[in-house]
Regions:
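S-adenosyl-L-methionine-dependent nucleic acid methyltransferase catalytic domains
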Residues: 1-155
Length: 155
């Protein structure tokens, strides 16, 4: 739908989802995060068209650290979800130039699926998620939690 509308994806943002209150998901390690894709019609905005394991690692660490400052601990399921959001953003950027919205839905779905699968492999998606999950966040990440909420932004 994003490509059919001629939009570009300028960001993928982590956001706690409504599943956080779901009793059957709570404590299972399943994702309770959503990836919010910020999309615009602006054709001048640069979007990433390449991804590496190192770049995906950086994106996921930034997400994890940001969420930790909000006192949210990421599970493997959360990181898998957030990583897929970043890869979807790259896939949209790569496919945008050659996208043919007149194709049948099944053809468009196959093209998008193949592009995403190639990015998953190229970025070593599952391995990167495991690496990010194993990194111990410094205590200072949690010590600064709530600073923004207590600062002048909301005064």
């Amino acid at each position: 739908a994003v490509l059919d509308a001629g939009l570009i994806c300028t960001a993928s943002l982590p956001c706690p989802a409504e599943m956080t209150a779901s009793l059957h998901i709570n404590g299972t390690g399943s994702s309770v995060m959503d990836s919010i894709l910020v999309c615009r019609a602006d054709s001048t905005t640069k979007t990433p068209r390449r991804v590496s394991g190192a770049k995906l690692h950086d994106w996921l660490m930034k997400d994890r650290e940001s969420l930790a400052r909000g006192r949210i601990t990421c599970t493997k399921g959360d990181l898998l979800c957030l990583g897929m959001g970043h890869l979807a953003r790259v896939a949209i950027g790569k496919l945008r130039e050659r996208w043919d919205s007149s194709l049948a839905f099944s053809e468009k779905a196959a093209i998008a699926t193949n592009e995403l699968a190639a990015l998953v492999e190229r970025a070593a998606y599952r391995e990167v998620v495991e690496q990010v999950l194993e990194i111990e966040l410094p205590d200072r990440e949690l010590a600064t939690a709530g600073v923004v909420l207590q600062g002048s932004l909301f005064d």
